[in-house]
A protein has these predicted regions:
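Conserved alpha/beta-domain cores
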Residues: 1-56, 62-73
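Conserved, mostly hydrophobic/aromatic
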Residues: 11, 21, 57, 79, ...
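Glycine-enriched alpha-helix->loop->beta-strand junction motifs that scaffold or abut catalytic
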Residues: 13-18, 23, 83-85, 172-176, ...
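Glycine-rich phosphate-binding active-site loops on the catalytic face of alpha/beta enzymes
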Residues: 18-29, 76-99
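Long, charged amphipathic helices and adjacent flexible linkers at domain junctions
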Residues: 47, 106-143
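C-terminal helical cap(s) of enzyme catalytic domains, especially alpha/beta-barrels
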Residues: 93-115, 243-248
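Nucleotide-binding motor/catalytic cores of P-loop/tubulin-like NTPases across gene-expression machines
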Residues: 164-166, 172-209
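C-terminal binding/interaction regions
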Residues: 216, 224-232, 236, 242-248
Length: 251
């Protein structure tokens, strides 16, 4: 609501993430302000690396029709281009007649938009708002290396509490982030972060054998021998300790 928007920065400082619920927002603010607020909320969440979900009426017509309107397709596309980590359906899947088609349509649009994202511009903008920490420096370096090296097809981030993967996600790399964690709850939490594919591993000594595990994970997720991945982790291990990156060949 309006009060939440007015206090957005203080909310973001303590929240795990934020949702742009356009329906609720539209009850209290003028219609023409909703898209302005949406872009502003997404931008601020992106700047500090907190996941942001855009929701409500995204493919509303698909509750009764197998295809969306062109305006709805544009709405989904713009939510992705604005920087949403997640785009969410509600009634379309909870009560609509075409739930599978709605999810498929949203997926197709999102993937198409991700191909068009100006990754270099996004990275340069994110660098300006970075916290100038070791973890941000690692995230920037990982995203930059992925842009410069065509052979790099993915990032493998070993993460205990999820902060390493979220920090990399903040800088919007152009390849997927395989976030390897040994905790189921962390795996679930990372589902909302942009570009992150959370993977639970029960290989407890993975941090001392990360090259081998990274190759296994890469091949399990569609990469092939000869591709390259960027590995990042923290030594010694612990939440928020990311201080290492290396580029290795999948074998």
């Amino acid at each position: 609501n309006q009060e939440g928007y007015d206090n957005l920065e203080s909310i973001l400082s303590v929240a795990d993430g934020v949702m742009v619920a356009r329906g609720d927002l539209g009850v209290e603010v003028s219609t023409q302000l909703v898209p302005i607020y949406q872009k502003s909320i997404i931008k601020k969440a992106n700047e500090i690396g907190k996941p942001v979900i855009t929701a409500t009426h995204m493919l509303e017509s698909m509750m009764a029709n197998p295809r969306p309107t062109r305006a709805e397709a544009s709405d989904v596309a713009n939510a992705v281009l604005d920087g949403s980590d997640c785009i969410m359906l509600s009634g379309e899947t909870a009560a609509g007649e075409y739930p599978i088609e709605a999810v498929t349509t949203m997926d197709i649009i999102a993937r198409a938009m991700e191909e068009l994202l100006p990754y270099r511009e996004r990275l340069d903008a994110a660098i300006k708002s970075s916290n100038k920490t070791v973890q941000d420096a690692i995230g920037i370096s990982v995203a930059d290396a992925a842009l410069q090296l065509d052979k790099v097809k993915a990032i493998v981030a070993f993460t205990q509490g999820g902060s390493t993967a979220r920090r990399i996600s903040k800088f919007r790399p152009c390849v997927p982030i395989f976030a390897v964690t040994f905790t189921k709850s962390v795996q679930r939490k990372l589902e909302t972060s942009w570009g992150v594919i959370p993977i639970f591993s029960d290989v407890q000594n993975a941090m001392t054998n990360d090259d081998e595990l990274a190759s296994i994970i890469a091949k399990d997720n569609g990469l092939k021998e000869g591709d390259y991945v960027i590995i990042t982790a923290g030594y010694p291990t612990g939440e928020g300790t990311a201080n290492m990156m290396k580029i290795v060949e999948v074998k």
